[in-house]
Amino acid sequence: MLEKFERYPLTFGLTPIEKLDRLGKHLGGKVEIYAKREDCNSGLAFGGNKLRKLEYVIPDAIASDADTLVTVGGVQSNHTRMVAAVAAKIGMKCLLVHESWVPHEDVVYDRVGNILLSRILGAEVRLVDDGFDIGIRRSWEKALYEVKARGGRPYAIPAGASVHPNGGLGYVGFAEEVRAQEEQLGFAFDYMVVCTVTGSTHAGMLVGFAKDGRQRNVIGIDASATPAKTKAQVLSIARHTATLVELGSELAEDDVVLLEDYAHPRYGIPSEETKEAIRLCARLEGMITDPVYEGKSMQGMIDLVQKGFFPAGSRILYAHLGGAPAINGYGYTFRNG
């Protein structure tokens, strides 16, 4: 599906699929749970899902003769960390706009984790007061203008690389990769669980799995707390991406499965249930999930298993998208483990 698109390699290649046997047994043993470890996909600044997306964005950045990658996210954005790492790798400058998406209680929140890594990577880091939104950000547009004004050649990468024209392609590739691994495993996954915020990871998976009719088996767990806007953005990105890859079938609104029950109390703030899911996964599998994204999707998957959402015998693939560095910004929350 992606043969005609230029790709700049930023990842090691195939990411491993690991059975979460102890977690599955703890939850009753009626389903099998696996994780695809996108958190282990690269040596670039701890890796993560954004690199898979950026592989299809960076060729255009290089071709445009840009000298500065400019992007936006929250203070503990995984995406901005990844863009900073990629800029260092390809020899470009980097300007990161960090908006105040999360009302945090930890005094070192803006000095540890992802933002610390971005500073170490040499990015110009800018903190602004604008609040959370998944759309095009005014602060980011201002930064692009300022780079031009000082003689630079900026390349615009939106939040999560999601509404970039090629933002959905990487996770079409994820689905293709899973299909190849399923042949090796000797079975196909019945459901795929993924965290959804800016939407292109979910959208790309939806398009990729639509090739074999499994688009509604991609279960998005909303972590944005703006589900209507997020669902609309997933559908928009998916339809655009389907056109790019010539899927050959129309995607319906109902193809976007987005569960809204796990983003509470708001973006970037973990509920008690999310914290417990993070602890449970860590203590049963040694797998670290973060309070912003993966902790919420892990909580969602655990709750769905416990409620019987997945039929007995189902094989579930949890997409671990990375993000563990953000947990450093929640030291007070997890001060006692």
UniProtKB/Swiss-Prot annotation:
Record keywords, A-Z: Hydrolase, Pyridoxal phosphate
Example GO molecular function: D-cysteine desulfhydrase activity
Gene3D superfamilies: 3.40.50.1100
EC number assigned by the record: 3.5.99.7
Catalytic reaction annotation: 1-aminocyclopropane-1-carboxylate + H2O = 2-oxobutanoate + NH4(+)
Oligomeric form and interacting partners: Homotrimer.
Protein name: 1-aminocyclopropane-1-carboxylate deaminase
Record organism: Mesorhizobium japonicum (strain LMG 29417 / CECT 9101 / MAFF 303099) (Mesorhizobium loti (strain MAFF 303099))
Upper taxonomic lineage: Bacteria, Pseudomonadati, Pseudomonadota, Alphaproteobacteria, Hyphomicrobiales
Encoding gene (name): acdS
